[in-house]
């Protein structure tokens, strides 16, 4: 088995618009505080984070044959330590993200790629068999390859993002995962849910709480333990990618042998490094400015 992590899921080209508050659902005018374009996508964020930490990582993602896709390919190809396996999705996924200084976000999907089965799926299937960890982010490709990932016998990590506890789309990811990450945006009180996830077979379930850090529940098969980690205080420039960086930091630390508490602290430190850049990860600063 290699030390390489396989990441499957979205990459996007994003326009970020900073606002002092998220718009109300009524007709009105609102002025932006600023805007910029950058790399997006939860899987790109995780892969960038792992590469920056020195972890061998291969990103399997879908990017369109359009100008935004050309930009994404050129940028990601310039990131040291990041191996890419790209599928032409005709259209590149594009988002318009409205962001507040508090990290609140509304994501408007401007376009989505063609993510139908393709011969390239076989490359991802082959890579899974020798991966230290398989990260399956929410996407059609990841979802249809869940049975293959489970058959590979390698640990599966997933990120449910703002899961509400009932979404049918998320359920196969939840059922397959050994390690589950999510945020608290829509779950209500997260601790009972995390305990339920671990009770159903996951060995670790983590919920990020923004400025309040994160909580987690772990199990070694006999003992269930609750964990908490504080956020590392920084002056926040942009919260995009912080959750991906947190998960990357935890994953890298655990593969290096850290226990859960030490890994959560490593995740918090890595997340803090992303909060002080306007890009998905500080490794993009030198490329995008």
Stretches found by the model and what they are:
Residues 1, 31, 194-289:
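Conserved phosphate-binding/catalytic region of the ribokinase-like
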Residues 1-60:
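Glycine-rich phosphate/adenosyl-contacting loop at the front of the ribokinase-like
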Residues 1-11, 73-87, 95-225:
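Ribokinase/PfkB-type carbohydrate-kinase core domain
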Residues 53, 90-93:
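Short, basic and Ser/Thr-rich N-terminal targeting/leader segments
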Residues 56-83:
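A glycine-rich beta-to-alpha transition motif near the start of alpha/beta enzyme domains, typified by
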Residues 60, 108, 227-230:
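Hydrophobic residues at beta-strand termini and immediately following loops
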């Amino acid at each position: 088995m290699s030390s390489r992590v396989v990441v499957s899921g979205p990459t996007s080209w994003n326009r970020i618009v900073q606002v002092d508050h998220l718009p109300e659902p009524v007709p009105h005018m609102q002025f932006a505080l600023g805007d910029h374009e950058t790399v997006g996508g939860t899987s790109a964020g995780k892969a960038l984070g792992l590469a920056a930490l020195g972890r061998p990582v291969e990103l399997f993602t879908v990017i369109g044959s359009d100008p935004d896709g050309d930009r994404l390919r050129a940028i990601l190809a310039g990131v040291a330590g990041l191996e890419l396996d790209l599928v032409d999705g005709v259209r590149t996924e594009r988002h318009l993200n409205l962001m507040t200084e508090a990290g609140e976000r509304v994501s408007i999907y401007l376009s989505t790629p063609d993510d139908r089965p393709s011969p390239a799926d076989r490359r991802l299937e082959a890579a899974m068999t020798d991966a230290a960890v398989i990260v399956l982010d929410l996407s059609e490709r990841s979802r249809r390859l869940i049975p293959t990932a489970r058959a590979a016998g390698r640990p599966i990590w997933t990120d449910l993002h703002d899961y509400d506890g009932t979404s049918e789309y998320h359920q196969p990811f939840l059922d397959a995962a050994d390690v589950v990450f999510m945020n608290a945006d829509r779950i209500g009180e997260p601790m009972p849910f995390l305990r339920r996830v671990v009770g159903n077979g996951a060995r670790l379930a983590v919920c990020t709480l923004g400025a309040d850090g994160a909580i987690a529940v772990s199990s070694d098969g006999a003992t269930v333990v609750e964990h908490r980690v504080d956020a590392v205080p920084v002056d926040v420039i942009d919260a995009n990618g912080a959750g991906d960086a947190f998960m990357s930091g935890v994953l890298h630390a655990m593969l290096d042998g850290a226990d859960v508490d030490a890994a959560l602290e490593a995740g918090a430190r890595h997340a803090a490094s992303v909060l002080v850049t306007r890009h998905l990860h500080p490794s993009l600063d030198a490329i995008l400015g």
